[in-house]
UniProtKB/Swiss-Prot annotation:
Organism classification: Bacteria, Pseudomonadati, Pseudomonadota, Betaproteobacteria, Burkholderiales
InterPro entries named among the record's database cross-references: GTP-CH-I_C/QueF (IPR043133), NADPH_dep_7-cyano-7-deazaG_red (IPR050084), QueF (IPR029500), QueF_N (IPR029139), QueF_type2 (IPR016428)
Residues noted as binding substrate in the record, renumbered to the chain: 80-82, 220-221
Recorded GO CC terms: cytoplasm
Protein name as it appears in the record: NADPH-dependent 7-cyano-7-deazaguanine reductase
Species the sequence originates in: Burkholderia pseudomallei (strain 1106a)
Active site per the UniProt annotation: 181 (thioimide intermediate), 188 (proton donor)
């Protein structure tokens, strides 16, 4: 299915009963082909979705709420278009379920089917909300740099590394990522963390490269994969991980993670802007 056939940018009828058919899958392959990603993938990872507007009825008709987190493997053939995800979650609101476990099972079944891979789903109930803390991405901030930036279309020529110098291990972060929805043109705001081992990457060039996404159109997952492959090709690090946390829209935030080496799942603590 193509994005132009999705619910994005169209008049919406909100379902009042649970409806799994509202989920709109979009194949990953098309966007990957555009940036030269084929099989085998040069990375693995996860897309972490947090859903803050989930509610259903219990068996006695009383509304229940939870925050749902979805872990979608990067190896899945499809992503789910975000507005369709919102409409799907909204369809739970007037539907009775026996328990939170029954809701979680339905979410796992439906989203896994849409993505074409097994998706992990976790529900945080109100009793657990106090445990959900805010935090910022760890790393040296690129935003401290005082520099000129005038290029707002993706330009990987900014990416350079000093291959004559000793390898380093660095974690770099910036809050200046902005891209745009390819269907509606709405801005997507995010923070990105880049961890690598290899020749030192020029910090100013890396920040200018991230800033160059400002007029770029692409879904969150596609932007992170473009960042990953551009850095991998231009700077040739031995190890590379890219993790972005995008601000919420429609009750959902999307946080893609890509890496080429084994490591623990990144922390899902939301940032202040989320």
């Amino acid at each position: 299915m193509n994005p132009e056939h999705s619910p994005l940018g169209k008049a919406t009828v909100y379902a009042n009963q649970y409806d799994a058919s509202l989920l709109f899958p979009i194949p990953r392959a098309g966007a990957r082909e555009q940036i030269g990603i084929g099989a085998p993938l040069p990375f693995f990872g996860t897309d972490i979705w947090n859903a803050y507007e989930l509610s259903w009825l219990n068996a006695r008709g009383k509304p229940q709420i939870a925050i749902a987190t979805f872990y979608v493997p990067a190896e899945s053939p499809n992503i789910v278009e975000s507005k369709s995800f919102k409409l799907y979650l909204g369809s739970f609101a007037q539907t009775a379920f026996e328990s939170a476990d029954a809701v979680r099972d339905a979410l796992k079944r439906d989203v896994s089917a849409a993505c074409g891979a097994s998706v992990t789903v976790r529900l945080a109930t109100p009793a657990e909300f106090r445990k959900l803390q805010m935090d910022e991405l760890d790393g040296l901030s690129l935003d401290r740099l005082d520099l000129d930036a005038h290029v707002y279309e993706t330009d990987p020529s900014f990416l350079t590394a000093s291959h004559g110098e000793a390898p380093v291990e660095e974690t770099l972060v910036t809050d200046l990522l902005k891209s745009n929805c390819p269907v509606t043109g709405q801005p997507d705001w995010g923070s990105v963390q880049i961890h690598y081992v290899g020749a030192p990457i020029d910090h100013a060039g890396l920040l200018r490269y991230i800033i160059s996404f400002r007029n770029h159109t692409g879904f969150h997952e596609q932007c992170v994969e473009r960042i990953f492959v551009d850095i991998l090709r231009a700077c040739q690090p031995v190890k590379l991980a890219v993790y972005a946390r995008y601000t919420r829209r429609g009750g959902l935030d999307i946080n893609p993670f890509r890496t080429n080496y084994n490591q623990p799942m990144p922390d899902n603590a939301r940032t202040a802007r989320q």
